[in-house]
């Protein structure tokens, strides 16, 4: 869901999917790369897409990697910060 300041918070579904399948993540400029357990990248990408976040321009999933294009580098950094918080 999106906050009134344009930030986003993870839904319970995304929280569960991420906790179960993410093995690593990082960003460069406006691009985020998420590594998952084999076969689970599509589930992670679908969960991100389902959130309809205005800062996410799109996702692309392989077998164990999700590529997320964010609107800008600040959004990518904030998104990775949320993932980090979620996984800790």
Regions found by a protein language model. Give the residues of each.
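Short, basic/aromatic recognition patches that contact phosphate-bearing ligands
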Residues: 1
